[in-house]
Amino acid sequence: MPEAIEVRKVPLHSVSDASELAKLIDDGVLEADRVIAVIGKTEGNGGVNDYTRIIADRAFREVLSAKGNRSPEEVAEVPIVWSGGTDGVISPHATIFATVPADKVTKTDEPRLTVGVAMSEQLLPEDIGRTAMITKVAAAVKDAMADAGITDPADVHYVQTKTPLLTIHTIRDAKSRGKTVWTEQTHESMDLSNGGTALGIAVALGEIDMPTDEDVMHSRELFSSVASCSSGVELDRAQIVVVGNARGVGGRYRIGHSVMKDPLDQDGIWAAIRDAGLELPERPHSNDLDGQLVNVFLKCEASQDGTVRGRRNAMLDDSDVHWHRQIKSCVGGVTAAVTGDPAVFVSVSAAHQGPEGGGPVAAIVDLGQ
């Protein structure tokens, strides 16, 4: 049986700041050696050369090492997933997941939050965006489900991943071995890596059948409703965090999910919060959350047809500001308006993650019992 989970959201006061994690440990809210995952937003450009993710990663791992007893190698294995880019009102923050000692667990037989982690086999540059990647990711997702004690895919509400994208160095490496890569555009490879990973999640959870190489980035009707995929230069494997609910684990927290049909779909966010177990009025307001919402996690994407609700926009044609940053800022504002809190996890590049032009939403709530 997996252990119950404590989950807290903390602000980042600067890109290298992990003081709020240290404070949680010092105050006895959680133990350094029991931290099993961190998911957060940093204030970089969100692109290939966004090194704020590496800086924040180092800061958090240094606190875990200094405050706990795990070896550097053990701390290095803790999944810490940073999504770069806090465009608009989105505020840099981290959501920290830690297991709870049995003697401190709130007992209940109701479904409660459970977390499982896994790492895939090495993803070679020639794998990215192809069925080799999908197969390796799917296997790792199943490992993470087992780690979370989840047997029914319906109990999985959020799968956060971090995978490698392509760089000039890895493209050259593939070519030196006589291999080809899906694209030589490094920024485009971010969307590609995320999309291929999402299809792997969808396969693992039975949402779709195994796709072909040709389906990747093209057959947008193939998607996962719970995938949240990020990519970067920090690793060469798929780092998987599966978050769901299980009976018997105990604890105060529960997760739910839904999808946004488009960037303005506030109802999709509220549906995820309801699915997590909060009772809300027919037309809810942020005041109705009453401090029980821990965080929401969203992916977003500019619709390939260049419209929202029949109105055209210029995001995909804008040469000054990439559409990644524009849609993230838009959805970040919509989400913050719902939650009343700009510290929300909104990540861009949602190919095969939720419906075309929309994206998946997960919500974690504190039920207090």
Curated annotation (Swiss-Prot):
Q: Pathway, according to UniProt? A: Pyrimidine metabolism; uracil degradation via oxidative pathway; malonate and urea from uracil: step 2/3
Tell whether Magnesium is among the UniProt keywords. yes
Under catalytic activity, the entry for this protein gives:
barbiturate + H2O = 3-oxo-3-ureidopropanoate
Q: What does this protein do?
A: Responsible for the hydrolysis of barbituric acid (2,4,6-trihydroxy-1,3-pyrimidine), an intermediate in the oxidative catabolism of pyrimidines. Catalyzes the hydrolytic opening of the pyrimidine ring of barbituric acid to yield ureidomalonic acid.
Instruction: Kindly indicate whether the keyword Ion transport belongs to this entry.
Output: no
Which species does this protein come from? Rhodococcus erythropolis
One Pfam family recorded for the sequence: Amido_AtzD_TrzD
Q: Name one GO molecular function term.
A: barbiturase activity
Give the quaternary structure.
Homotetramer.
The family line of this record is:
Belongs to the cyclic amide hydrolase (CyAH) family.
Q: Residues annotated as region RU C? A: 253-369
Q: Where is this region: RU A?
A: 2-104
> Which residues make up the binding site for substrate?
53, 83-84, 194, 230-231, 328, 347-348
Please cite one Gene Ontology biological process associated with this protein.
uracil catabolic process
Q: Which keywords belong to this entry?
A: Hydrolase, Magnesium, Metal-binding
Any idea what this protein is called?
Barbiturase
Provide the site residues for: Important for substrate specificity. 324
Q: How is its activity regulated?
A: Inhibited by cyanuric acid.
Q: What is known of its domains?
A: The monomer structure is formed from three repeating units (RUs) that share the same structure as one another. The monomer and the active site possess nearly threefold rotational symmetry, to the extent that the active site possesses three potential Ser-Lys catalytic dyads, but one of the 3 active site surfaces varies in composition suggesting it is involved in conferring substrate specificity.
Q: Give the first-level EC class, as a single word.
A: hydrolase
Q: What Enzyme Commission number does this protein have?
A: 3.5.2.1
Q: Where does Mg(2+) bind?
A: 301, 350, 353-355, 358
What residue spans carry the region label RU B? 112-247
Catalytic residues at 162, 230
